[in-house]
């Protein structure tokens, strides 16, 4: 995706850019910014999911909720393997079902959306060292040459861009609240629906850093329009106290909301904006808002990616792929187990697209 700029005013998109596989021209108005019979096994999974949901809803402490959102499995039992096998039947591997995905994508304009942590890079203890491999970077580079591509992350936009190290992509940081295209101007942003919250976010960041100093292993990350309190390196016995500390701080800021991810507490502005809204915004800004032959593909591993999966299901258009090694309640249609499988899928998708494009050129009749 080269030579692409999209300029957005407060009320709408002023201009759209020509992209690989995408239309050129202005987009529409701005959006308001995944050992019994199969049936018995499915019933078991449904009941298990309901039990997890009920348990989360009735948590009497933050530690309970934090455990529910960040399950830890040092090893898999036979029942775990059976459960995962049944889950994969419902959310099959995007690799084993690649031909099916290719058939659904044939003749469509593919637009790629990917989370960063846990999708393009492994989950690590220190979020500042979540580097992607050179092989993954090369794969993403090929994807961006072939399809319009965006990285949608909870991270600060500039930080995730530095991790990825590629310029020809769209970057949506802070869970989609800070979107920028491949422009030469580092200050030009496409969309920042939570700009008014910046002073408040900075204030809360300083308070949380001070309050969590007493908790060994806790790390507060400023993602510009949202904050992350990582507890992956915190002793589980301290989770409840840490959760209460964070909760007490956020209680003083009714315009902010507290949510949970994979061993992380997220503080975000209470506005109607998430990764799903970011996906819709990017599709519109690229000129695909009302395009019947577009195929958005979203790959992510976190609970916040579910907002994007829901949008794709609601549209009845596109593919959601959850990256996970354990069963999760998800709106994604397909699954991949880890970043290694993500990279394999990306390379196969690029290879398929290039072969199919070459084939269509070969059989094109002369005029």
From Swiss-Prot:
Alphabetized UniProt keyword annotations: Hydrolase, Stress response
Query: What InterPro entries is this protein classified in?
Result: HAD-like_sf, HAD-SF_hydro_IIB, HAD_sf, OTSB-like, Trehalose_PPase
Enzyme class, top EC level, equals hydrolase
User: What EC number(s) is this enzyme filed under?
Assistant: 3.1.3.12
Q: Which cofactor does it need?
A: a divalent metal cation
Catalytic reaction(s) noted: alpha,alpha-trehalose 6-phosphate + H2O = alpha,alpha-trehalose + phosphate
The family database entries (Gene3D superfamilies) matched by this protein are listed as:
HAD superfamily/HAD-like, Trehalose-6-phosphate phosphatase related protein, domain 2
The biological processes this protein is annotated with in GO are: trehalose biosynthetic process
Keyword Cell inner membrane in the entry? The reply is: no
* Any coiled-coil regions, as ranges: none
* Top-rank taxon, per record: Eukaryota
Pathway per the UniProt entry: Glycan biosynthesis; trehalose biosynthesis
Q: Which GO terms describe its molecular function?
A: trehalose-phosphatase activity
Keyword presence, Hydrolase: yes
Kindly give the CDD domains that the UniProt entry links to this protein.
Answer: HAD_TPP
Query: Which family does the record claim for this protein?
Result: Belongs to the trehalose phosphatase family.
- What job does this protein perform? Removes the phosphate from trehalose 6-phosphate to produce free trehalose. Trehalose accumulation in plant may improve abiotic stress tolerance.
Protein name as catalogued:
Probable trehalose-phosphate phosphatase 4
| Upper taxonomic lineage | Eukaryota, Viridiplantae, Streptophyta, Embryophyta, Tracheophyta
Q: Which gene encodes it?
A: TPP4
């Amino acid at each position: 995706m080269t030579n692409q700029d999209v300029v957005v005013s407060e009320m709408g998109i002023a201009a759209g850019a020509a992209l690989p596989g995408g239309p050129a021209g202005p987009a529409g108005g701005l959006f308001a910014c995944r050992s019994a019979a199969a049936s018995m096994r499915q019933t078991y999974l449904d009941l298990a999911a309901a039990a997890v949901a009920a348990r989360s809803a009735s948590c009497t402490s933050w530690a309970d909720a934090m455990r529910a959102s960040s399950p830890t499995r040092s090893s898999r039992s036979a029942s775990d393997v059976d459960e995962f096998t049944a889950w994969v039947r419902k959310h099959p591997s995007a690799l084993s079902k690649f031909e099916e995905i290719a058939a659904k994508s044939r003749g469509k304009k593919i637009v790629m959306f990917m989370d960063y942590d846990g999708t393009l890079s492994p989950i690590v203890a220190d979020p500042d060292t979540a580097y992607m491999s050179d092989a993954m970077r090369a794969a993403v580079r090929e994807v961006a040459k072939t399809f319009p591509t965006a990285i949608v992350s909870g991270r600060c936009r500039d930080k995730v861009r530095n991790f990825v190290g590629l310029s020809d992509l769209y970057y949506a940081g802070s869970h989609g609240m800070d979107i920028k295209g491949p422009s030469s101007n580092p200050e030009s942003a496409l969309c920042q629906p939570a700009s008014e919250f910046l002073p408040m976010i900075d204030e809360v960041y300083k308070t949380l850093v001070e309050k969590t100093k007493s908790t060994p292993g806790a790390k507060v990350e400023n993602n510009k329009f949202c904050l992350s309190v990582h507890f992956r390196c915190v002793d589980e016995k301290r989770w409840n106290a840490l959760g209460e500390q964070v909760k007490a701080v956020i209680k003083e800021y009714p315009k902010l909301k507290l949510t949970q991810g994979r061993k992380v507490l997220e503080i975000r502005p209470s506005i109607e904006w998430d990764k799903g809204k970011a996906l819709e915004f990017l599709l519109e800004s690229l000129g695909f808002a009302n395009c019947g032959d577009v195929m958005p593909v979203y790959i992510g591993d976190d609970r916040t990616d579910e907002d994007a999966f829901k949008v794709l299901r609601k549209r009845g258009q596109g593919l959601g792929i959850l990256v996970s090694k354990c069963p999760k309640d998800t709106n994604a249609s397909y699954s991949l187990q880890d970043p290694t499988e993500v990279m394999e899928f990306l390379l196969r998708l690029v290879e398929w697209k290039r072969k199919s494009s070459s084939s269509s050129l070969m059989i094109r009749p002369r005029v």
